[in-house]
Swiss-Prot record:
Signal peptide: none annotated. Keywords: Aminoacyl-tRNA synthetase, ATP-binding, Cytoplasm, Ligase, Nucleotide-binding, Protein biosynthesis. The gene is lysS. Its EC number is 6.1.1.6. This is Lysine--tRNA ligase. Belongs to the class-I aminoacyl-tRNA synthetase family. The lineage of its organism: Archaea, Methanobacteriati, Methanobacteriota, Stenosarchaea group, Halobacteria. GO terms for biological process: lysyl-tRNA aminoacylation.
Length: 545
């Protein structure tokens, strides 16, 4: 077995998923091979949750290529207790709202209860847990990854965990001994089971007796700690079956491996240093089950800060797909799992450019470095919906943002063809697919309010320039008409034209922005004008239309 942190780094294979698949295959697994991930549906599912889904997906695809039948399971740990109130929630249309916009009191009164026993704050699903699980399902569907969502609540209710619960309770002395190696405050009274109070619904931790023959435990509904807070128990004394409660996380996770027959599971570095070592020991010593092949990944950050549903610093898959094509988003997860990555929305253009180079590498662009081409050979077929016969036509993201300044589809096409980003012999399908990026880039410009967040003035604005500025604009029009300059040549000519006509260069740029954007400022004018239809530019510079 490779070191926990080395598996999947790409040091053994050009694409890390192949190295992970090698480890799984070396165990000669039964089919279907089961790849697992999981999340507690505590709030809005965000991009970070897709680390497990996408890492698992690429390993699953690598194994499928080798002829294995693979099942990709994702557990929604919806029998976990609500420990604190999230700052943000989302309805099923992905409208993100603050806690104050729903019945926060109803959520507060349900602290300590399982997510599936808490009413949906939007009133559309069976429970809080069902609501956020549905959002997760829709996100996976939107990104095009077929996962089998499994509810922990349903597994408990169906008896799937019965044997694991019985083993944990029957071997509770061993369980205590194992857990005490990884966790403080494990005394002789510790029992690895949380009964659910029949009176108030709280998951309590005070077990008074165990009847293995009857499959029940006695309990007292006592106070439980939730972070820095204490949730008061109601004091009820009763009995609970193995299905009316749950295992603690450090036992439930390895129990899932046994119940679902898990062969491979990626997880974040937080589990690598805590839950994984204890889970591995519990799996072997309490459940007599070999743990799956593990793989650790680094977390993502969002604009430099940790992604967190509870803290409200999130970006959803739905939001990202407004800004990027699905293949570009999937590509994000092909990168080395060992390195932390920041999803910086303001610099998405750089990331899209990186994807375009990656794609070009797959199609043999020799300017792409050898190691990147090797990775593209393996990973590119997994990130696209359908492998194209020839390289797709891609408009650079920032240029697409320029095209997004107008809603005129014909003008967009003219500008893209004029710039050479869409070849004249492109098919109708290639053109439509290339232009799809324009709406994505426009959404990015609006979201970040960057230098591309302007609208092209499609009719001549009301302008009045002094004689020197008017002469400079006419001279610039003649230059464009006769020279058909590229973007940098035109940018330089604007400076030279201003000097020759004794016009302040800032004033000449402002005049250009007024003519084309009806604004006093804007993006670099040379690249903007060189991207447009030449006749349109000449006529506008001459104030003719």
């Amino acid at each position: 077995m490779s070191d926990l942190y080395d598996l999947g780094t790409g040091e053994k294979r050009p694409f890390w998923a192949d190295a992970a698949a090698d480890e799984v295959e070396a165990r000669d697994p039964d089919e279907p091979v089961t790849i697992k991930g999981g999340v507690s549906p505590s709030g809005v599912p965000h991009l970070g949750h897709f680390n497990e889904i996408m890492r698992g997906y690429f390993v699953a695809e690598a194994l499928r290529e080798r002829g294995y039948e693979v099942r990709q399971v994702f557990t929604t740990d919806d029998k976990d207790r609500l420990r604190k109130l999230p700052r943000k929630l989302a309805d099923l249309d992905w409208n993100v709202v603050g806690l104050g916009e729903v019945d926060a009191g109803a959520l507060g009164r349900n602290l300590g209860r399982p997510y599936t026993d808490i009413p949906d704050p939007f009133g559309c699903c069976d429970s809080y847990g069902a609501h956020f699980t549905e959002l997760l399902r829709r996100s996976a569907e939107a990104i095009g990854v077929p996962i089998d969502l499994v509810s922990n609540t349903e597994l408990y209710a169906g008896g799937d965990f019965d044997a694991a619960v019985e083993d944990a309770l029957a071997n509770r002395d061993t369980a205590r001994e194992v857990l005490s190696e990884f966790q403080d405050k494990v005394d002789d009274e510790y029992v690895p089971f949380f009964p659910q109070c029949a009176e108030c619904g709280l998951l309590t931790e005070t077990v008074t007796d165990i009847d293995l023959d009857d499959g029940t435990v006695g309990y007292v509904c006592s106070d439980v700690e939730a972070g820095d807070d204490v949730i008061e128990g109601c004091g009820h004394e009763g009995r609970a079956t193995f299905r009316a409660g749950k295992l603690p996380w450090r036992f439930e996770w390895p129990a899932q491996w046994r119940v679902l027959g898990v062969d491979f599971e990626p997880f974040g570095k937080d589990h690598a240093e805590g839950s994984w070592p204890s889970g591995k020991a519990v799996s072997r010593e309490v459940f007599d089950t070999e743990p799956p092949v593990p793989m650790v990944y680094e977390w993502f950050t969002l604009n430099g800060d940790a992604l967190s549903s509870s803290a409200g610093n999130i970006i959803t898959v739905d939001e990202v797909l407004e800004l990027l094509e699905p293949a570009v988003l999937r590509y994000f997860f092909t990168k080395n799992p060992k390195k932390q990555r920041d999803f910086d929305v303001s610099n998405l253009d750089r990331f899209v450019d990186e994807f375009d180079r990656f794609e070009a590498g797959y199609f043999g662009d020799e300017s792409v470095e050898d190691d990147e081409r090797a990775r593209a050979d393996r990973a590119y077929p997994m990130v696209v919906d359908e492998l194209p016969e020839r390289q797709p036509v891609r408009i650079p993201y920032t240029f697409a943002a320029v095209l997004g300044m107008t809603d005129d589809r014909d003008l967009r096409l003219q500008m893209a063809q004029r710039s050479g980003h869409i070849p004249d012999d492109a098919t109708d399908d290639q053109i439509e697919r290339a232009l799809e990026r324009v709406e994505k880039a426009r959404a990015w410009a609006v979201r970040t309010d960057n230098e591309f967040n302007y609208r092209l003035a499609e009719t001549l604005p009301a302008v009045d320039f002094d004689a020197e500025t008017a002469a400079a604009l006419d001279e610039l029009a003649a230059f464009v008409e006769t020279e058909s300059p590229d973007d940098e040549t035109l940018q330089g000519e604007i400076y030279e034209t201003a000097k020759r006509n004794d016009v302040d260069v800032g004033d000449l740029f402002s005049a250009g922005y007024r003519l084309f954007l009806d604004e006093s400022e804007g993006p670099r004018l040379g690249p903007l004008l060189s991207a447009m239809d030449e006749t349109f530019v000449v006529e506008r510079l001459r104030r003719e239309g």
